[in-house]
Amino acid sequence: MGTMTIDGRKVEFTDEKNVLTVIRKAGINIPTLCYHSEVSTFGACRLCTVEDDRGRTFASCSEEPRDGMVIYTNSGKIKKYRKLIVELLLAAHCRDCTTCVKSGECVLQELAHRLGVHNIRFQNTREQYEIDDSSPSLIRDPNKCILCGDCVRACEELQGIGALNFAYRGTEAIVIPAFNKKIAETQCVNCGQCRVYCPTGAISIKTHMDEVWEALADPDVRVVAQIAPAVRVAVGDHYSLPKGRSVMGKIVNALHRMGFDEIYDTTFSADLTIMEESAEFLKRVEKGEKLPLLTSCCPAWVKFITDQYKDYIPNLSTCRSPQGMMSAVIKEYFRDPENAKGKKTVMVSIMPCTAKKAEAIRPNSFTDEKQDTDIVITTTELLRMIDNFGLDFAQLEPEACDMPFGFGSGGGVIFGVTGGVTEAVLRRLSPDHSKETMREISECGVRGDEGIKEFTVPYKGMDINVCVASGLANARTVMERVKNGEANYHLIEVMACRRGCIMGGGQPVRAGDRTKAARAKGLYNADNTMLIKKSDENPMVLELYQGLLKGKEHKLLHNDFF
């Protein structure tokens, strides 16, 4: 604890880990390209450089605050220094900004404008590299890389994968997969966190918007959309609506106006997932086999297990993800000529997750060897489509989803935040429907920001040991403990992205804990407003089991990971 003088003003600090944090606490938005509080300090971009009263310059991100420090953040020397750094970065950077997918959201572009860089005095001598589009989810363009290392640290430290790293030195330095492999040839799980942390267009989402527009323009095609829970609390950010507010009704209106024929809510199939997964869990607990049960909703987590913990593949739940269940059910529904009305059905999935693109083409997620989810677009792609269509989103009136697959429970909505799957399972297993019981379940340890949460819940005279993890680095810690016999769980829920789908690789990029908290709160608020809290109380789900699903539960709702 102490006091610093920043640009002539006294600023107190307590437990801030670096000078940069204290400066921002003082209300000064000092620029950075390589600093993120969630990962280790790299100090490579030097944009956060400041000057002290002795004329010494240093990177504020890697300097600890000390009592009595006198800091100048915008001296003449510092301003020239920052401008020169950006100019040098741009000199070695692909500058096709008008056609770049990151245009308008690029941090480097914003800094060039902010610092007044209008002329590049230096020649670009950097080698041109081949664009890597081998991944079903992401595109890597090394020509737009500024060597900030954000993707490297996110992949290694947050996800524990290490698919990317630096190679070579000096002017030949580049970020690539090991042995210069294509990204699809590595252990990349398609989570998209590298794209979230990348400040430029060096890593971007592989878009499938053109396929959607093509389907919408075909009069012989019925275009059906499903919308994941986390999407509804992220779209509003783009239109300056309050952070985390659910805008599901506006999204439905926008999709109807763009020409989608049917729009369904993935919370419906989340309820199906809970029905199937809770039954599977109880069966395994009773038999005492294939425990712990590993949830299978997150495709990045599933790929992580199938790639790196093959001995635990039998522990994965055989349940399809909510996306997979919804697509299979809808395709089955429209196989009935009375429902099909002579049209081909194209299933479009709108997800917060880049890994869902990979899941959709995974052969073991098909039904009768046919792909159920035809196209997956992310929240970010949805925003571009809405903007492309010219809709004034903020002014749209809310509309309800279509039936019979447009209604879900509160348990289905909270799938979008870490711990939501487990909480919905616990609700399903509880015989008590009271508000007090629902509150007790929510307070048992299933909610919160911790990367690893462990708790025990009583069930029919036995203790159920549960672990909830978010971020694959945390998941690896959990799996190593299980593998070494250091932990004994009955149920493990993992979401590859920190805080869950609300911060997925396909979501609009908004830094900071406030965004995470607001999106999580938005889903919990949506849950609070729903009359039905438990998946087994959803009348549309119960009706489906008595009708379309009868005798087809395993075929449509489960898959085989072997």
Residue ranges and their predicted role:
Residues M1-M4:
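Short structural boundary motif marking the start of a folded domain
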Residues I6-R9, D52-R54:
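Short strand-turn-strand beta-turns centered on an Asx-Gly dipeptide
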Residues R9-D15:
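A short N-terminal beta-strand-loop micro-motif at the entrance of redox/enzyme domains
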Residues E12, S134, K144, Q187, ...:
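Charged, low-complexity surface patches
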Residues D15-G68, N74, I78, K206-F562:
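Iron-sulfur-associated redox domains of electron-transfer enzymes in respiratory
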Residues R46-N190, I203-D218, R222:
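Fe-S ferredoxin-like electron-transfer domains
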Residues R195:
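Conserved glycine-bearing catalytic or ligand-binding loops at nucleotide- and phosphate-handling centers
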